[in-house]
Structure formats: structure tokens, C-alpha cells
């Protein structure tokens, strides 16, 4: 049994290890659009990746020293209430701003400059929303329900009262997330303002029809992939809804006893959220260009190559995770079923998704932030000469730290989940082995992608 002092030493060791690795090399974030080449690492890639995978394995061994249940519970149950007097006002103002922003984005996409970096629609959607606002969902709190313009509009429309089939569960949101990212990768959605405005209009129309048919609460809870992404990211954030009001908690601690992941569709969505960010970065690597080139040269259409890669890669990610759940029943013999273990250990993966998203987009957001401001100030004519920031060479070390920090947080959350599930300490520790192996694999792949120079996806 570890004392609080021992646990503090373990935590300090983890932080020191992450910071040491962060200083070992540099890597630049990349995004699905407006890409720029990143710098190479200053250390051999094989050593970088091996060390990154080893630190996750070592962190698991260190975390196993914290076996005092009362100490673990004290960390995850720490809460501080926050004042919520501004809640109703915030929702009203947020929904109004959201509707205005939606209309403005569509108008700017149609009537604004054709150059992506000068068009406010492109800059607001990709830089302001999907990079900046998405980061705030897991770094601060999930404010999307209060801002979502489509939720605000549909909440004021009559509903048809149709019954949503329970058997579908969260699967429509899984398909929707994969489809959205696929379209974003294979089309000039991030470079063509007209296409972006059209796509947003189609998405809005589908959402309005669906929400009116089954009711906004059911639609945004089960079907809408964007709402689910932000809701899941919000569980990583230090501020969230505690039932009776907003509360401050330690980052990621809301993942330990989360009941929203209660079916195979929810598990599949968590894995999909990890996979789509990985896929978005994978297709910008030179290795992918070589593989895709070989297949396209053999006569296979490029879109088919990307589609198969998206579906097959997701199938591998999901299959590996499900196999880990089945294997956990053998490493820690238990009456709990593999699907139940899969549901219990899925929320920690959201810390991985958040860490990689932060590494993937923070540099992109900071680089294009001045251009975003300039585009908003000149929505129709566009800025004459958009300015992009040049990040210092050491910034790449932060990206490495974000990936590793996300994985270490995921391991700690999985540790708490295991101790909540199993009464025996050894059983709780052994149940984590397969899931930690999966996390090490995800870490190694993520670090490799971050380490690679960023190229435009080929053959598109």
C-alpha cells in the first residue's frame, strides 16, 4: 500500500520523465488544411519512438505503486463547487452568438474571398472552431451545448414525435464522425470556401430534419457526431456539470465513473475519436505517400484507397481494443464480461484523444491566429496580406509532451477504473495489462506521426 508521500514521488517521477522526453526533440503540429512542412527531429526516430513507448510502460509500473484505495479515491473525488448564476444568461448569449456565427460563416463562404487563408469562413471553422474552440472543450469546459446554433434553432421548432430506434444506439454518430473526417481529408473542404459553405448547409439541413423528427434531445444525444465529440472531450476538462451545478475537478477525473459509455456504440465512438485524428495525421506522412502511390499506380482509384484505409484502419483500432478487453478476462480472471470491461476502460482513451488533438492543432492554431483575426475584420474583401506566426524551434517539444501527458493521464484513469471494478489489488493491476499495451501502441503511432514532416495528402 502506497502512502500519499510515495504517490507524490511517483507523480513527480512521471512529470520528470515526460519533461525529459519533451526536451529530446522537436516536432511541428499539422492539420488537415493550410499545411506546412514540419521540421525533422534532432534525435534518431527509432530512439525517439522507442523511448516514447517505454515511458508509457514505465509509467504504468510506477502507477501500480499507488494501491491505496482511499488515496486514489481522494484524487478522483476532489471537487469544488462553482457559482452558476450566469448559466441562463450564458446560454442565451451563447446560442445567439452561435446562430449569428453560423449565418456569417455561410455568407462569407459564398460571398467572401476565394483564397482560404483570407476567407473568414475557412478560418473560423478550421482555426477558430475545430482547433481553438475544440481545445477549450477539454482544457477548460464543454461550452458547445450553449453555443451550438443548430441545437438553438431546433429547440424552438415543433417536433414530429417519431421514435428513435433504440437498437441504433450511438452507431449513427460513429458513422457520421468517420464520414465527416473522410470528406474533410479527401476533398478541398479546408481550401474551398464555397464547398465549405455548401457542406455546412447540407449538414445543417440534415440536422434540422433529424432533430425535428425524433426531437432535439434524442438527436443531439445519440445521432449528432459533433455534439458527442464535444461532450466526450468535456469529460477530460477541469470544469463540468456535477448534477447540482458546475464544479471544478482535476483534469480527466470525470472519466473514472462515467456511465455514458454504456453500450458497444459508445465504445466504438471513443475508439473512432482516437482513430480519426490519427488518420488525419497519417495521410500527411511520406510513408503513406509511398504506400498510396504503389496502390494507385496499380490502377486502384485514389478515393477507394483512402476509403479502404479509413475503414480498415478503424477496424484494426476497434478490433485491437476489443481483443484487449477479452484478454483482460484472462490476465485478471473475472466474472465480468468482455463487453463490460470494454465499456469500463473506454473513457480513459479520451485522454489520449485530447492529448493528440492538442499536439495536432495547437501549433496550427497559434500560427494562423493573426490571419483569423484579420479575416474576421475584413469578411468580404479579405485581408490584403494575412500574417502567420513563426513558432520557436522548441515548440515541438510541447507537442511531444502533450501526447505523452495524454497517455499518462489515460493510464492513471484506467488505474482508478480498475480499482473501482475489482476488490483484489492484484486483480485490479493485472486487468490493466492488455489496455496498457494498447495505449503503448497508440502512443508509438502518435509520436511517429508527430515526428514526421507534414506533406499534403497525395493523389487528391
Q: Residue spans of the language-model regions?
A:
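Transmembrane alpha-helix/helix-exit interface in multi-pass inner-membrane proteins
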Residues: 277-285, 318-326, 352-378
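Alpha-helical transmembrane segments with an aromatic anchor "belt"
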Residues: 327-359
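Hydrophobic alpha-helical transmembrane segments
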Residues: 47-53, 153, 169, 303-316, ...
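Interfacial loop-to-transmembrane junctions
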Residues: 338, 413-439
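Long, internal scaffold/assembly segments composed of regular secondary structure
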Residues: 220-326
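Juxtamembrane boundary at the C-terminal end of a transmembrane helix
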Residues: 445-460
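Hydrophobic alpha-helical transmembrane segments and adjacent short intramembrane/lumenal linkers
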Residues: 349-356, 367, 371-405, 411-415
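Transmembrane-helix bundle segments that line or gate the permeation/cavity pathway
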Residues: 2-250, 255, 279, 403, ...
